[in-house]
Amino acid sequence: METKATISRLIPLTNDGRCDWSETSQKNQYKLTLGTNVIYIGKSTKLLNAYAVEIVDGIGNVVTKEHYRTPEDSIETSILYSSIEAFLDRKYRKHMQEISDKLTELEKSTVVIA
């Protein structure tokens, strides 16, 4: 099981196509920083032939921590992708809601002079 091979398949995560994977001090563990959020992926210390994926938000809270057996298996790999994509979608949706709320607020406070 090759950690880097699995990680390389996760590369197109950001909108601009860039990813900043870096190694951590733990053996066979890598992290991806997306804004203030960090995704860790590495070999599981609890399960044989498995990966641990942990998503940490900007203030250090663990958003999700999952163990996936043999991500080379297409079903497990798609679950791994879905987990990360769902997290990114939730973050994106949150920001879109904030933007929408601000626009609504501006519309209500704007006086139109005819």
Predicted regions located by residue number:
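Mixed-charge, Lys/Arg-enriched low-complexity segments
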Residues: 1-22, 58-114
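Amphipathic, interaction-prone secondary-structure segments
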Residues: 19-59
